[in-house]
Amino acid sequence: MSKLKLHGFNNLTKSLSFCIYDICYAKTADDRDGYIAYIDEQYNANRLTEILSETCSIIGANILNIARQDYDPQGASVTILVSEEPVDPRDVDTSEHPGPLPSAVVAHLDKSHICVHTYPESHPEAGLCTFRADIEVSTCGVISPLKALNYLIHQLESDIVTMDYRVRGFTRDINGVKHFIDHKINSIQNFMSDDMKSLYHMMDVNVYQENIFHTKMMLKDFDLKHYLFNAKPEELSAEEKEQITRLLYKEMQEIYYGRNVPEV
């Protein structure tokens, strides 16, 4: 897409929101409480602030304000307001490719925000526990928040990720013509690195005419030892391992597809 000569500021709003899920099996009520306490501490407001602040540093944004809160009994929220440094729109790369990791600081944001909320929870009886982090990066201007995607997924490695990217509003060129998007995109996947894509099953549901893009990700490899809390596979019988594996797989399928799967 050729560079547009705009009349005034770029008024497009670009929002990337995604949920990351960590799934775990904790056999007893005490184990489930222990997992919730553990994951709540791992992703407390201070840790989330560090992650989001590093994100701002990577994409070259100025932090204007930070609001953070840990909740009782669990959960945390962090919101960071940011603004961009001066940037020449002609120097902005809007092509589809993975965004930067900490070693590559290349992007800038404008009058924007980054926020995260966490939601630990557990099944009342089945031993299943899930942790969800809900993250949104919203920008106004020439830069796409998709540049932050690759780093955040690397930082918050998860079993399942669901992402939505949307461009809202319009901007006007010097001839008065409205433009409802200012860059080419056919999939969020084009902004992820190859090594990341190789780890996940991925599926797109896009509404191109509305500038709405949706991608789901679920880990390909399943190793039971990574999903047990306070337990090891060798401590379980073959029957227990099969039952737990079935429970975890069903849980992950339901989250990935966004619907309950009936018992067979």
From Swiss-Prot:
An example Gene Ontology CC term for this record: cytosol
Residues in coiled coil: none
GO MF term list: adenosylmethionine decarboxylase activity
Pathway annotation: Amine and polyamine biosynthesis; S-adenosylmethioninamine biosynthesis; S-adenosylmethioninamine from S-adenosyl-L-methionine: step 1/1
Keywords: Autocatalytic cleavage, Decarboxylase, Lyase, Polyamine biosynthesis, Pyruvate, S-adenosyl-L-methionine, Schiff base, Spermidine biosynthesis, Zymogen
GO biological process, one term: spermidine biosynthetic process
Keyword Manganese belongs to the record: no
EC number of the protein: 4.1.1.50
Record PTM: Is synthesized initially as an inactive proenzyme. Formation of the active enzyme involves a self-maturation process in which the active site pyruvoyl group is generated from an internal serine residue via an autocatalytic post-translational modification. Two non-identical subunits are generated from the proenzyme in this reaction, and the pyruvate is formed at the N-terminus of the alpha chain, which is derived from the carboxyl end of the proenzyme.
Residues recorded as bearing Pyruvic acid (Ser) in the entry: 112
Family the UniProt entry places it in: Belongs to the prokaryotic AdoMetDC family. Type 2 subfamily.
Subunit structure: Heterooctamer of four alpha and four beta chains arranged as a tetramer of alpha/beta heterodimers.
Name recorded for this polypeptide: S-adenosylmethionine decarboxylase proenzyme
Encoding gene, per UniProt annotation: speD
